[in-house]
A protein has these predicted regions:
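Short alpha-helical segment of the dimerization/phosphotransfer core of two-component systems
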Residues: 73-81
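Short conserved segments within the C-terminal catalytic ATPase subdomain
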Residues: 119-129
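Short helix-loop "hinge" at the ATP-lid/N-box region of the Bergerat-fold HATPase_c
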Residues: 154-155
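Short conserved segment of the HATPase_c
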Residues: 186-200
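Conserved micro-motifs of the catalytic ATP-binding
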Residues: 93-98, 131, 135-138
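A conserved beta-strand-to-alpha-helix junction within the catalytic ATP-binding
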Residues: 7, 11, 99-114, 127
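Membrane-proximal HAMP signal-relay module
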Residues: 1-35, 53-58, 90, 106, ...
C-alpha cells in the first residue's frame, strides 16, 4: 500500500543521503591529506632558500656561485612541484576529457627522445627508440605526457653512461609501449605503491631532481582514461621496465 511504499522510499532516501555524506567525508579527508602533503613537499625547499638568502643578506655567508646555484636549484624544485600539481589538478578537475584523434606512438616516442637530448648528453646516456609505427585513437597531448614522464623518470634515475630503451609494437587490438632503463631500480616492497600520489621510494634522491612524486600518478590516470593498463618490473640496483598497453580504438 501507499504507507509501505512511502516507508520504502524514505528508507532508500536515507541510504542515499548516508552514501552522499560518506563520499563527502572521504573527499574532505583526501583534501586534507593533499593540503598536508603539499605543505610538506614545499616546506623544505622554501626553508632552504630562505635560510641561505638570509645568511647572505646578513653577510654571514659570501654570495658564492655555489650558494646561488643551490638557491636556484631549490627554486627549480619548487617550480617542478607546482607544475606537477597543476597537471594533476587539471586531470582530476576535467574528469579526463580526451580529445581523440589518430596518434602514432612511435612518432611521439621519437619526439620525446629529441626533447631529452640535452639531458641525455649531460649524463652520457644512450636512448634508443625501437619498434614499429603503431596508431591508436587517443589524446595526443596526454599520450605525449605519458611517454615524457616515463622517459623523465628513466633519465633521472639512470647512472652515467647507462642506456634507455623505448619500444613500441602492435599486439593484436592493442599497442604496447615499453620504457626500460639500467638505473637504480625499485625495491620489491615499493613497486605496488609507486603510482600513488606523492609516493617516492627514496625521498632524498628527489632533492636534485625536483617534482613531488606525482609523475607516475599522472601517467596511470591518463593510461586508465584511454582504457589501458600500466605495470612495472624492477630489481633494486638493476633498473626498471615500465609497460603500457593501450587499445587501438
Amino acid at each position: 500500500d501507499k504507507t509501505n511504499t512511502a516507508a520504502l522510499e524514505l528508507a532508500q532516501l536515507g541510504q542515499a543521503i548516508d552514501h552522499m555524506a560518506e563520499n563527502l567525508e572521504k573527499q574532505e579527508d583526501v583534501r586534507r591529506q593533499l593540503t598536508s602533503d603539499v605543505a610538506h613537499e614545499l616546506r623544505t625547499p622554501v626553508a632552504n632558500v630562505s635560510s641561505q638568502l638570509e645568511a647572505m643578506i646578513e653577510e654571514v655567508w659570501e654570495p658564492t656561485k655555489e650558494r646561488l646555484q643551490s638557491c636556484y636549484d631549490e627554486l627549480g624544485r619548487i617550480s617542478g612541484i607546482i607544475s606537477d600539481l597543476e597537471k594533476l589538478r587539471q586531470i582530476e578537475a576535467s574528469n579526463m576529457v580526451l580529445e581523440k584523434e589518430p596518434v602514432d606512438l612511435l612518432e611521439l616516442a621519437q619526439a620525446v627522445k629529441t626533447a631529452f637530448e640535452p639531458e641525455l648528453a649531460k649524463k652520457k646516456l644512450t636512448c634508443m627508440v625501437t619498434g614499429e609505427s603503431a596508431i591508436i585513437s587517443g589524446d595526443q597531448r596526454r599520450l605525449h605526457q605519458v611517454i615524457f614522464n616515463l622517459v623523465s623518470n628513466a633519465v633521472k634515475y639512470s647512472t652515467e653512461s647507462g642506456q634507455i630503451l623505448i619500444d613500441i609494437h602492435n599486439s593484436g587490438k592493442n599497442v604496447q609501449l615499453t620504457v626500460k632503463d639500467q638505473g637504480i631500480g625499485i625495491a620489491k616492497e615499493d613497486i605496488p605503491l609507486i603510482f600513488e600520489r606523492f609516493y617516492r621510494t627514496d625521498r632524498s634522491r628527489n632533492r636534485k631532481t625536483g617534482g613531488a612524486g606525482i609523475g607516475l600518478t599522472i601517467v596511470k590516470a591518463i593510461v586508465l582514461a584511454h582504457g589501458g593498463n600500466i605495470s612495472v618490473e624492477s630489481v633494486k640496483g638493476c633498473g626498471s621496465c615500465f609497460m603500457v598497453v593501450l587499445p587501438k580504438k
